Curated annotation (Swiss-Prot):
Segments for region (Disordered): 460-506
Alphabetized UniProt keyword annotations: ATP-binding, Cell cycle, Cell division, Isopeptide bond, Kinase, Magnesium, Metal-binding, Nucleotide-binding, Nucleus, Phosphoprotein, Serine/threonine-protein kinase, Transferase, Ubl conjugation
Any one Pfam family match given in the protein's UniProt record, by short name: Pkinase
Single annotated GO MF: protein serine kinase activity
Cellular compartments annotated: Nucleus
Protein name per its UniProtKB record: Cell division cycle 7-related protein kinase
Cross-link (Glycyl lysine isopeptide (Lys-Gly) (interchain with G-Cter in SUMO2)): K260
Phosphoserine PTM positions: S21
Cofactor: Mg(2+)
Subunit comment: Forms a complex with either DBF4/DBF4A or DBF4B, leading to the activation of the kinase activity. Interacts with CLASPIN (via the acidic patch); the interaction is required for phosphorylation of MCM proteins and CLASPIN.
One GO-annotated biological process of the protein: positive regulation of nuclear cell cycle DNA replication
Annotated active site: D171
Residues that bind ATP: I58, G59, E60, G61, T62, F63, S64, S65, V66, K84
Length: 564
């Protein structure tokens, strides 16, 4: 089998001066790029130059870039500051909500706080205390078991803090939970994707949710209808209030002026109802603004018109009530799919009726590999439990020595990978609990978490070594993965060629092993207590309603001898 290119440069015989020249060139290009970014930042927000000296660019994400800077204090010494530059296209309400999360919940209990904030036009820079930290991947296999306990304990302290304020972080992962191993300091950072619970104490998060709901409604304003002529687009039906609201253009109608005689509300509403063409209906009563009829003819026609309009109003009210009832029935059908369903429910096909429905809108923000089952299945009611699932995935990586543990290209593949560990039947039952129907072509049994983690960490000498990937990268037990979706198998095989694999070597048989200079710390790993896997099981509970909370996790027996 052809050897991955990531490992071809590890052998001394293959090295040549061109490799070193290429590395130097890439390094110079990177440094020049960082220098250019710093110059552009100082130009965009010139007041930064008066306060900070920007040293380096230490991070970059989809919505922001982070720089290391120093501030000259009055006492004479320098203080390191992390400057987070938000992309100019960020919504002002989203920026304000992130700032409020940092000021209200931050600054204690391992949650990053806020020092300053600068703005120039559409550029916003948040200044926060700088915490020097290690890369999670670099220290993963050198952490002692006690360090893992401390890491998880402090993560739950931070999550308990933000959950008390009704903040759902949505992006809990190792790179957002900074860890200084030497100082034993921790910090939960990046509230750019944060959302509020229904009773959140962060007022601006309520507005962020309402803004998101309005955007979702506007995206669903036009939905497809499948018929014999193909896919058509039509506007969503108006609500009852919208249908009953008089339009200002009606006031220009002569018909209204002609009918309107008194000041009572009834005749006014009759007059408004005459000009029905405003609501998209044909009107056969439009006539010239100059009338040549006698008063008697006018009176007779008026009485007839009033009778006709009264009947129309009664019909309209019936139609409105019918539409309202249909709307309620649609909502009921959506919430109770087992009662009101179509022919394709519970099968592996999708009918034209389902294809014509609006796409279900639900928050999906987060990092692939750390998103909970309810996020992957677009459950609209998402709570702080999604953060606890992400914490469980981190704990799974720490216990197994594999990172990232899950790595999928799409939501269905990610769900299939979760089934590989937690079981297909259990996943289906949990999905049913929060109103989702999940189908799996083959039944995949749930794995024993202790056996899985020990096998992946290499503590079980009776289990053959895995050829799928090195320690530090996600891999699955071949016996379990053979029952999964072919997408999951394809993703699993691709992980062996990840760039991070260059930290490990492969022997002649094709198996991965630690390099000799790897400082693996085996302290405590030979006797991991059952409480660790019990906590892991509760964190990876597929049902968000019964998943353990951060407050309950801190009281778990796994942390019984740690101070609160």
């Amino acid at each position: 089998m052809e050897e991955p290119m990531a490992f071809s440069s590890l052998r001394g015989s293959d090295r040549c001066p061109a490799d070193d020249s290429l590395k130097k060139y890439e390094q110079s290009v990177k440094l020049s790029g960082i220098k250019r970014d710093i110059e552009e930042l100082c130009e965009a927000v010139p007041q930064l130059v008066n306060v900070f000296k920007i040293k380096d660019k230490i991070g970059e994400g989809t919505f922001s870039s982070v720089y290391l800077a120093t501030a000259q204090l009055q006492e004479g010494h320098e203080e390191k500051i992390a400057l987070k530059h938000l992309i100019p296209t960020s919504h002002p309400m989203r920026i304000a909500a992130e700032l409020q999360c940092l000021t209200v919940a931050g600054g204690q209990d391992n949650v990053m706080g806020l020092k300053y904030c600068f703005r120039k036009n559409d550029h916003v820079v948040i200044a926060m205390p700088y915490l020097e930290h290690e890369s999670f991947l670099d220290i993963l296999n050198s952490l002692s078991f006690q360090e893992v306990r401390e890491y998880m304990y402090n993560l739950f302290v931070a999550l308990k803090r933000i959950h008390q304020f009704g903040i759902v972080h949505r992006d809990v992962k190792p790179s957002n939970f900074l860890y200084n191993r030497r100082l034993k300091k921790y910090a939960l950072v990046d509230f750019g994707l944060a959302q509020g619970t229904r009773d959140t104490k962060i007022e601006l998060l309520k507005f962020v949710q309402s803004e998101a709901q309005q955007e979702d409604c506007s995206r669903n304003k036009y939905h497809g209808v499948v018929g014999h002529k193909g896919l058509l687009s039509r506007p969503a039906p108006k609500t009852v209030d919208q249908q009953c609201t008089p339009k200002t253009s009606v006031k220009r109608s002569y018909t209204q002026v002609h009918i309107k005689q008194g000041k009572d509300g009834k005749e006014r509403s009759v007059g408004l109802s005459v000009q029905r063409s405003v609501f998209g209906e044909r009107n056969f009563n439009i006539h010239s603004s100059i009338s040549h009829e006698s008063p008697a003819e006018k009176l007779i026609k008026q009485s007839k018109t009033v009778d006709i309009i009264s009947r129309k109003l009664a019909t309209k009210k019936t139609a409105i009530s019918t539409k309202a009832m249909n709307s309620v029935m649609r909502e009921t059908a959506r919430s109770c799919p087992a009662v009101l369903t179509c022919d394709c429910y519970g099968s592996d096909r999708v009918c034209s009726v389902c294809l014509s429905r609006r796409q279900q809108v639900a928050p999906r923000a987060g990092t692939p590999g750390f998103r909970a089952p309810e996020v992957l299945t677009k459950c609209p009611d998402q709570t702080t439990a999604i953060d606890m699932w992400s914490a469980g995935v981190i704990f799974l990586s720490l216990l197994s020595g594999r990172y990232p543990f899950y790595k999928a290209s799409d939501d269905l593949t990610a769900l299939a990978q979760i089934m590989t560990i937690r079981g297909s039947r259990e996943t289906i039952q949990a999905a049913k609990a929060f109103g989702k129907s999940v189908l799996c072509s083959k039944e995949v049994p749930a794995q024993d978490l202790r056996a899985l983690c020990e096998r992946l960490r290499g503590l079980d000498s009776t289990t053959p070594r895995s050829a799928s990937g090195p320690p530090g990268n996600a891999s699955y037990d071949p016996a379990a993965s053979k029952n999964t979706d072919h997408k999951a198998s394809r993703v699993q095989a691709a992980q062996a060629q990840h760039s991070e694999d260059s930290l490990y070597k492969r022997d002649n048989d094709g198996y991965w092993s630690h390099p000799k200079d790897c400082t693996s710390n085996s302290e405590g790993w030979d006797s991991v207590p059952d409480e660790a896997y019990d906590l892991l099981d509760k964190l990876l509970d597929l049902n968000p309603a019964s998943r353990i909370t951060a407050e309950a996790a801190l009281l778990h027996a796994f942390f019984k001898d740690m101070c609160s």
